[in-house]
């Protein structure tokens, strides 16, 4: 039986590899239609880095600092094994962790019938995290 972690990771990989075959244009994603909210703890520098990354991609970002993100993770039914240091809400989707733009872009263009996507942990070289992906 496939567990939810495997399913979500497979979904992220699928998004990353097939984003060139999408119908919506990049301008539709970046024209300000997507207001996003990032829930994070006040002291997390990498979370702030992800906010800056989203703003560079022309998203309108609202930051909500919280001492504990447990209630947000619970509200959006994010499995414990898929949780990361911050949760972003984009329309009807959650984006958990340092998910690359290609995956976010594909999610918003295709609008699949899922709750969200996740990249658990804090992988080196992902948006908001220092280092190169090759490390």
Question: Where do the protein language model's features map onto the residues?
Answer:
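Loop/turn elements at helix/coil->beta-strand transitions in domains of secreted/extracellular proteins
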Residues: 35, 59, 113-115
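Active-site-proximal beta-strand/loop segments in catalytic clefts of secreted hydrolases
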Residues: 39-41, 64-66, 98, 120-122
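Local sequence-structure signature of Cys/Sec-based thiol-disulfide redox active-site neighborhoods
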Residues: 29-57
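Bacterial N-terminal signal peptides that target proteins for export
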Residues: 1-8
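Thiol/selenol-based redox catalytic cores and closely related redox-interacting motifs
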Residues: 75, 81-135
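Boundary at the C-terminal end of the N-terminal hydrophobic targeting segment
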Residues: 22-26
């Amino acid at each position: 039986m496939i567990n939810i972690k495997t399913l979500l990771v497979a979904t992220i990989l699928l998004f990353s590899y097939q984003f060139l075959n999408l119908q919506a244009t990049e301008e539709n994603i970046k024209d300000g239609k997507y207001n996003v909210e990032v829930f994070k703890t006040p002291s997390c520098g990498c979370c702030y880095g992800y906010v800056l990354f989203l703003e560079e991609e022309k998203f309108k970002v609202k930051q909500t600092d919280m001492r504990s993100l447990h209630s947000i993770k619970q509200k959006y039914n994010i499995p414990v094994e898929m949780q990361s240091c911050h949760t972003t809400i984009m329309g009807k989707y959650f984006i958990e962790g340092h998910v690359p733009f290609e995956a976010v872009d594909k999610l918003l263009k295709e609008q699949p019938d899922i709750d969200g996507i996740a990249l658990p942990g804090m992988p080196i070289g992902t948006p908001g995290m220092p280092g190169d992906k090759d490390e």
